Amino acid sequence: ALTLKVSYGAQGNDNLGTYYASSGLYSVVSNNGENALVSDRLATPKLKWETNLNFNAGIDFSLFNNRFSGSFDFFQRRSKDLLYSRPLAPSLGYNSVDENVGELKNTGVEIDLKGTLIHTRDFMWRLGLNLTHYKNVVTDLPLKDMPVSGVHKLAVGRSVYDFYMKQWAGVDPENGDPLWYKNVKDANDKITGRTTTNDYAQADYYYTGKSSLPKVYGGFNTAFSYKGFELSTIFAYSIGNYIVDRDVTMLWHNGSSTGRAWSTEILNRWTPENRYTDVPALKTVSNSWNANSTRNLFNNSFLRMKNITLSYNFPQPMIKKISLNSLQLFVQADNLLTVSKNQGLDPEQDISGLTYYRPCVPSPEESMFRSKALIPGKGLLQSYAPPRFNHA
């Protein structure tokens, strides 16, 4: 069987937070016994909804009496009048102003496949896979040179998830200072090359060629059944995405912050005897070496076993003797295995690509034992032993 599907529609987005209704209004405050009126945000009476124009096309199929099935979907979303909080100069008295700033296009594919690979009288093997790949491109902006926003900068032809950061250049072997790259310019202010600086404020921003958007992400599952037993697993994965890990940088201070924990990397710090290293020398004053740069930009690809379950369904002749329609015992565990290049604690993060003060424990490993019984006239009865947690 084959089914074709096509859809098109418009969708609005007004995700500006709850403060929008009070923008432009004043609050009465008191400071040192003096009353005053304070405005938190600039009024934006011409601000409009962000509009998303969505197009989807695909096919659903099934083969061999539904033994194999799946779907292929193509989608494109064109967004215009993008909602954006544009940073303002501190001299204006406001941090930012909400604006409709440009247009954006998302294009991608989604694939979902599942099938029964082996099916005999006593044994069955099922397998499922899904993946998503999409690209994100800014197509129009009101300004040629948009301001830097965190670790990103909007630019036509680039993704909103591209990292725009200062680039780490290593450690000066002569004195242990941290180094970053900065541009070299001629008399006409034209960039002619790059050099290094130990002053973080003098370093320039660059597009890194890395993105917080995965090249592909999704999951897969498999299940093996033999007579009444079944073993099933569920995996999630993400490939090609990067993350700026601000959690690990809290352990990368240079010694000027007393009483704080250190990463074990500090054992490889610069000393006169260890000149060629990537960890700067200890200092009594801050040198910004743990500030945002490509040094704390990590590959966040991962593979995680989300769940594994072993179950047993008792034979019908046996359970009918005790007035049950069905009886199943099973043991399951979550998050038993995670493979990741990221030094952080949990690779499953949001699409922003920036973490800070994440929970200080990874996703917990959880295991439990349960039983389910279907009782005629009374419905489903479940019982289980309390779960056990193990924080790896």
PLM regions and their residue ranges:
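Short loop/turn motifs that connect adjacent beta-strands in outer-membrane beta-barrel proteins
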Residues: A1-L2, F64-R67, I118-W125, V138-L143, ...
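Outer-membrane beta-barrel signature, preferentially recognizing the C-terminal barrel domain
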Residues: V29-S69, V97-T120, G157-D162, S211-Y217, ...
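Conserved small-residue
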Residues: E99, T116-S212, W252, D334
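C-terminal beta-signal and terminal closure region of outer-membrane beta-barrel proteins
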Residues: V101-N106, S149-D177, I266-L267, P272-N274, ...
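Transmembrane beta-strands of outer-membrane beta-barrel pores
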Residues: Y8-G12, F74-K80, G115-L117, L131-V137, ...
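Residues on the lipid-exposed face of transmembrane beta-strands in outer-membrane beta-barrel proteins
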Residues: A57-F61, F72, I111-G115, F220-Y226, ...
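Extracytoplasmic gating/loop element in the C-terminal half of outer-membrane beta-barrel translocons
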Residues: S238-Q328, A333
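Solvent-exposed loop/turn elements at secondary-structure boundaries
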Residues: L2-E50, S69, D73-L104, P147-V148, ...
